[in-house]
Amino acid sequence: MMLRIVLLVAAAATTMAAQSTGRQTRAEMTNYEETSTYADVMFVIDDLVKSSPLVHAESFGKTEEGRELPLIAISDPKVTTPEAARRLGRPIVFVQANIHAGEVEGKEAILMLARRLVSGDLKPMTKQMVFLIAPNYNADGNEKITPMNRTAQNGPVAGVGTRENSKGLDLNRDYMKLDTAEARSLVGFMNKWDPHVLVDLHTTNGSYHGYHLTYSPILNPNADPRLIEFTKSKMLTPIRQAMLKSHNWRVYDYGNFSPEDGGGRENSRVDPANPGNTTWRTFDHRPRFGNNYAGLRNRIAILSEAYSYLDFKGRVAVTADFVEEIYKSVQANAKQIMTLTAQADRALTAPAASRPVELGVDFSISSSVDKVDILVGDVTKVPNPRSGRDMLAMTPSAVPVPMKEYVTFAATRSLTLPKGWLIPKTLAESPRLAAALDRLRWHGIKVQEFASDQQLAVERFTIAELTKAPRPFQGHQEARLKGTFDRVQLTVDAGSLFIPGNQPLARLAFYLIEAESDDGLVTWNVIDDGLAVGQTYPIYRVVDARAITVKSQ
């Protein structure tokens, strides 16, 4: 795999030699009129590898069109394997960019930060952390650069790539269903390297607010609450203060303006003198989104959204500064981050009797008790000479307006995390569940096989309601089940499958497997084929796992 990367880098370097100005990105070389192509990214990576003994480059998978997905590892001493990284006993921090290839400043910013880690002012950090960087996740979409994509975005004027991958799918909706080669590659990377902190770089448009960048921690309440609280209070709040004090950037919790009774409908423009019942509202709790998915893996996650109407150079700069402040926060809190993530894993692998964990299946967004000041901004039109269309540029206006904010979620109905889940042998061998088992294993979830026939107390789910979305989304008609549980004794045949509830990824397993999950195997039509009202859901909740004997792995 490394040979393929080297060959691709060599080809990119050959084609770029005439335009090269050392390790600069395409954005820097063109005064921020253009963004980097795949070849440009590979050229910069090649230069980093050649210029420093601290840099390792490899591929963590392939795109749908067969492009290698580059990964950079920077550390002193150099690490080339996950095992070597873990032996250092340091936080492993992963930053990915360009999941939406029209949102390109993260790709440029993280390559510039990589230079500083290798030979600049950030180099001392390489003795304290392991830095992992995936600068061009949606590599296929990145090759479809045109000025006619995201035309209202304030640069680069030469254009950007597409939001979707080559299959027309949004990679930031694919973390659970894993329909794309890219998402399967990324989850495989997470299983392999298991970073403590994950950062996802985006651009946001939407409402005309007064922030240069907005961010989000984990929004799903089923993540370990200690990780959520730590990210908010010990990382993001000090980072917000540092961004203003040290860099003069205004940053805040991600949101858009929405009327109090608007059902989540967004308003682009708000009149500061007459805001009415406007609120500030975040996006979504579901783990189809990367920051929420990482939370279910017991890891810290931060979403970064540079403001689309800030000019391209400014977006690159604010993103770079934000990631730098995240790095500094991890550096300052290294011991606590490693302790908290390890505790989150251990809390799920402790003896069953000591770990009752309640996890949500229904959720609602929560309002702040009091109104808070949210910065209301505005935009003006500026012409793009390449597209012939107007871009929108943020104005200096940033008026604080008191309003309620909705930036957290809470579970409204929960179930106890079971001792595990049972798939009877007759069902486990059916084509119907093959895709479900594939996905569980792709996610890194442990699946075991019963060694002998056994009697087992289980909870059986009977379907009372099955609803499907009227319109397809991401190639699926999202499904939802409602029903009731009853407790029964089953004779379980040898060869039946058991998914333990006492494994580090149990929160993720719960979200994928549970019949009433709002973003699981049922949601994405992996397991709903043939289900009907009155039928039994084919996966059972195990009540008592003490007597279970499984085959050794």
PLM feature spans:
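Structured catalytic-domain cores with a bias toward divalent-metal coordination
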Residues: 18-553
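Hydrophobic h-region of N-terminal signal peptides that target proteins for export
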Residues: 9-18
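Sec-dependent signal peptide recognition
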Residues: 1-9
